[in-house]
């Protein structure tokens, strides 16, 4: 059994005409395995990153069972620019290599909710899917959608038994574990990413959630994260220094507290058992909450450094239009569509997302803590006022407002925190102490930050220090000044 779909003759001919293998140039042949993976890509309409992501999925050395592209954009929520996602799907070439379904979930409240809604729509449509190389859409055909028909074909037919089987929740008849491969629109996996993830879960049957090593979108030699640890207060401790070169120094990691949702592979049964991610974490810390829930349910969370994914981190860097940042122009290799008007690229600025990230951290802190919610909320308010004052002293008024605003927002989220606690408790089969050994102490984070600041100061000193050539020139000038001064003194003595 092929890991993904049965390779169609039409797709093979299309690939042969391009002079490449089904997985892309230079990629190894797909393996045979009983494990099935369904790739799920969530996007807010057409973004500058979507095409590269879809191309990367199409070039996997092991193909997914099918690809679901979930579009959460609509006129009502203000997301997207109106460009049909089907155009990018067709332009990326992914629909010529594997089965693609475009579904829409404009009412989704976050990444996890979008995945849940998209899977539900996919299951409903699995009985009337599109057979053939082109991507199918859940929108009805007609004059209103004539523009979209340029990138899609509308032949309707039965989905293969394999695709329909993966759309359902039962996998007993298939004799293997079903997996969901979660992808953001700004997360482009390396050709062997899915293969490495599947190899990891095949070797570690107790692992239910595995994630790849994340590297920079434009400079993949720079590390972003290799799994994450946090304090008990959900404060992240990333051991990777900004700009750190990937030399395999973190490739010995395995069990971690958290893997991000970008590129994560999760057991479909576990995803359904947990009802996906918590709705209280729509954008940030959804991976942390999901990882904790998986751990408490008695499963392992593992990072797979051999699986690599490029991540733009558009939400973190404030590059989403909803965050006040203009969308970036696509990269030179992205071949933007004429119908996609890209604004002038905005400078990445994590401060744009600070308030949302702080709200997520405080919510996660209260959700995972066993302390009384009322006391925690009062402490958050005091902490917010204090941190806001510090921000003002350091001349960061925008961050000061964000600190206080986040504390006031969480102060009104007592009900959401209770629901989050009940959610974790309802699925817990092991003691919370299993997470304790994966925590990092706040003192360790402060120590690491002091070391980083010291290293930055040393780098700044070295950068400002003169080079050897400049030192030699300065020595020559000093020698000339001494000789000149000596000559002047001798002349004065002689005249005197």
Name each model-derived stretch:
Residues 55-64:
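Short, acidic, metal-binding catalytic loop of nucleotide-sugar glycosyltransferases
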Residues 105-132, 154-175:
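Glycine-rich, basic loop-to-helix element that forms the pyrophosphate-binding segment
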Residues 127, 175-188:
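Short beta-strand-to-loop acidic/aromatic patch adjacent to the donor-nucleotide binding site
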Residues 175, 190-230:
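Conserved donor NDP-sugar-binding/catalytic core segment of glycosyltransferases
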Residues 231-256:
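Short, flexible, basic/aromatic active-site loop/helix in glycosyltransferases
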Residues 296-414:
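Active-site-adjacent helix/loop segment of glycosyltransferases
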Residues 351, 366-478:
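Non-catalytic, C-terminal membrane-associated alpha-helical segments of glycosyltransferases
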């Amino acid at each position: 059994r092929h890991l993904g779909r049965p390779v169609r003759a039409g797709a093979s001919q299309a690939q042969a005409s391009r002079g490449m293998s089904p997985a892309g140039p230079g990629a190894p042949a797909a393996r045979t395995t009983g494990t099935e993976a369904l790739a799920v890509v969530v996007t807010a309409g057409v973004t500058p990153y979507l095409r590269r992501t879809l191309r990367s999925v199409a070039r996997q050395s092991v193909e997914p069972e099918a690809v679901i592209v979930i579009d959460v954009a609509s006129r009502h929520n203000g997301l997207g620019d109106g460009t049909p996602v089907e155009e990018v799907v067709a332009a990326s070439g992914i629909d010529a290599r594997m089965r693609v379904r475009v579904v829409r979930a404009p009412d989704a409240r976050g990444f996890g909710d979008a995945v849940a809604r998209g899977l539900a729509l996919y299951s409903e449509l699995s009985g009337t899917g599109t057979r053939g190389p082109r991507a199918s859409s859940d929108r009805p055909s007609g004059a209103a959608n004539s523009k979209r028909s340029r990138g899609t074909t509308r032949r309707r037919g039965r989905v293969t038994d394999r695709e329909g089987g993966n759309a359902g929740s039962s996998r007993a008849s298939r004799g293997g574990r079903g997996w969901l491969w979660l992808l953001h629109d700004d997360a482009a996996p390396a050709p062997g990413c899915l293969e490495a993830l599947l190899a990891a879960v095949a070797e570690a049957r107790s692992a239910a959630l595995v994630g790849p090593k994340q590297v920079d979108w434009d400079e993949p030699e720079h590390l972003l994260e290799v799994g994450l640890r946090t304090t008990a207060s959900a404060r992240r401790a990333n051991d990777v220094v900004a700009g750190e070169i990937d030399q395999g120094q973190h490739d010995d990691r395995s069990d971690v507290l958290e893997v991000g949702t970008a590129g994560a592979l999760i057991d479909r049964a576990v995803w359904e058992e947990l009802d996906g991610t918590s709705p209280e974490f729509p954008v940030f810390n959804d991976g942390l909450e999901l990882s904790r829930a998986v751990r408490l349910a008695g499963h392992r969370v593992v990072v797979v450094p051999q699986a690599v994914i490029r991540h733009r981190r558009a939400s973190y860097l404030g590059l989403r239009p909803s965050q006040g940042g203009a969308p970036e122009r696509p990269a030179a290799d992205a071949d933007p569509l004429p119908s996609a008007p890209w604004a002038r690229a905005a400078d990445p600025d994590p401060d744009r997302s600070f308030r949302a990230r702080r709200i997520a951290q405080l919510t996660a802190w209260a959700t995972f803590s066993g302390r009384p919610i009322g006391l925690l909320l009062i402490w958050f308010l005091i902490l917010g006022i204090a941190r806001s004052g510090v921000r003002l002293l350091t001349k960061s008024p925008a961050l000061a407002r964000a600190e206080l605003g986040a504390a006031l927002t969480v102060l009104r989220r007592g009900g959401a925190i209770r629901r989050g606690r009940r959610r974790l408790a309802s699925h817990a089969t092991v003691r919370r102490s299993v997470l304790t050994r994966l925590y990092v102490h706040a003192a360790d984070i402060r120590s690491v930050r002091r070391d980083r600041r010291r290293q930055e100061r040393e780098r700044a000193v070295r950068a400002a220090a003169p080079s050897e050539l400049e030192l030699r020139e300065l020595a020559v000038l000093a020698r000339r000044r001494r000789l000149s001064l000596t000559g002047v003194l001798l002349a004065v003595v002689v005249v005197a």
